[in-house]
């Protein structure tokens, strides 16, 4: 049987692929989109580990588990090759270069209001398309980096997914710096970490996000634009039909939209963090908010509202910290001040706002800096101040902490405000505060009244009455500078010489009972005022004028009657009544005054004080009285207190003041000389400045800060020789004329120590005998003459720097009955008793008077005064006491140098002090000879060692 051969069927030849070059544009774009979609799907499966080779094991284990990126089988290799092919064909849409900003290549086209806007569904569809393009581009960038950089990029991405928290944050920050457009996922993760309660990583995450947003993501000169406001209808026109460009535009617009949402979430997260109890985290959040507000304009209303609301935080440190932050913002961006004022105004008049929020808000407003261009801003501030002021005063509260701050802010804004006098039509409430509140509130109130009256080209007599009456109150040390500045400005502008003389008399009365720094400042003020007003006005009266006619009449009456009777006579000898008007002219003058009052009342406008109103608080139109009236220290109106014929006996008391500088200043006024002092008396003559010299330490270097707070307490900066340590060689080598009067006894003492030290070293004597020239007994006697106090008072002085420690000899020395020396185990300095001695004369006025009377009866003091006069003539030839040029409360500065030191008025007190020490040395030397020439070191002198206590006999 023959088998038939079957014809072999040849396999059909595969059809040749249609070349892509022959495809149209639409087909090419569709093919690319399909390829990219499949590549994205493959890449997602590959990255998630959904592709497995062992299907049986996968079925047994159930859900797929992520595996390492190892192309173990041909299937995975084919997928990767296909993805690489697609990547090579299409490429990354956004190729960001480090150092450039993404908004530099952004297409900033917004929707035109004239054109019709797309509906919400169309906008959402385009937004989703842009998000898809953004996610796909981020995946392509990750694949490309792994191809180009290899193991380094793979390691970086593995750290982001599997590393520690710190390493993750660092790797994310690097990726966000490299390409912000492809890093929104990392920003979202960091914000989510900040939202977790109780996390300690917030303090580290916040600076990273702050850096990314400010330096890499947010535009500098514009806000972020949401997707809905873009020119979506013009998308085809903007891309010119190019699908790749169209996709890139959608990607960038969607990125900016998502970035705006994430930034707002970041700000809201910071606001929530402020409510947490951790102070460090709160301050870090507030600082970040302030930096974002200063650096970028995005979400400034939300940030500013959060900062202003922080004024009312339960922790008072947070409110104070917020004030500092807002001050920095206002300095860097002055244009934002009006926005800040509006936000604070909403806070100030909001219901249920605590007092602390008002306090910090007004503190910030009161420290703003203004110029002539800020008239509208100042008017807005004045309206806020006066509204709160009326609210507080309406409750009859005079000790409110908010009042001084409001008045201080009003004083700063008033000169720059336009038509500010109309805002302050009724000054009755301000006068109420000036009369019934403490100095902390009264001084700003009086300053505001002075500015108000000065703007109206006159100063009301009512203001002078209030200021004159306020001087009787005890002024605290913190208000010294404000009071002196107000007094100087007021007396400089006053046209009534008689009233200025009355104020000078009152200031001298205050100076007698004040601390040395305030007393010296008052004397300097009087000297400067005398120089400004000229020599024609006599501000200081040293002798009392007696009317010759009154002397004759009094002599005649004293001859007839045994009893003395005092009457006031004018130049012609007519008797004057108590109010200073002749009896026969009294009725006629009263009639004239009443007629003038009727005419003035017609001229005065209601609600405003006029310069011509003689019936109210302006009494200058009545005219000066032509007769001498007795000085009345309790009179209310300084205009009618005639102090021109009353001698300033206070200067005699001040010339014997225990503080050398005060004594010489007073003597300069008595001799009609100008007080030459350019330093800061309120700082240089304080008790602490005096005690700091005994501490023998150099002052701390004060770092000068620029661009800091507007209102800041000025740090004390010693000038001239006061900067030198009293134990240094540079200090002891200074001449006597170069040393301030209140330090000459220290200079003499330390100089003598240096000389004795050299002599003792040459002779080989003990070091503890260096203080032989001045013993504790001499200091006790000297202090007793200036400040006699209670016996058995103890005070500590640390002389360890000069004498060193010599413990072996302490037990060998015996105590003497004159001085009881107690050696302390430590070197702590206790100067409480010395403090009491310095303050004793200021606390007990009666005791001071007694001391001054004793000085008048002391013959040695009288001789010393004669010697002081001789020394004063020599001192005038040496030049002024110069030093560092520093402005004082009077607005001028001292331009002299250290070489010109020597002609200051207060040098005489130091000479007197040194001469008294010499007299005491001679007396002590005589006593030492009688006792057999004992060493003073063993009789209570200054030994080597730490702090020593000296008991007075």
From Swiss-Prot:
Stretches for region Disordered: 1-27, 47-79, 580-615, 797-953
Q: Where is the composition biased (Basic and acidic residues)?
A: 18-27, 798-808
In this chain, composition skew of type Basic residues spans: 1-16, 927-937
Q: Where is the composition biased (Acidic residues)?
A: 586-598, 817-879, 892-902
**SS bond list:** none
Task: Give the record's GO CC terms.
Answer: nucleus
Spell out the SUPFAM superfamilies in the cross-references.
ARM repeat (SSF48371)
| Family under the similarity heading | Belongs to the CBF/MAK21 family.
**Full protein name:** Uncharacterized protein F23B12.7
Query: What is the species of this protein?
Result: Caenorhabditis elegans
Native organism taxonomy: Eukaryota, Metazoa, Ecdysozoa, Nematoda, Chromadorea
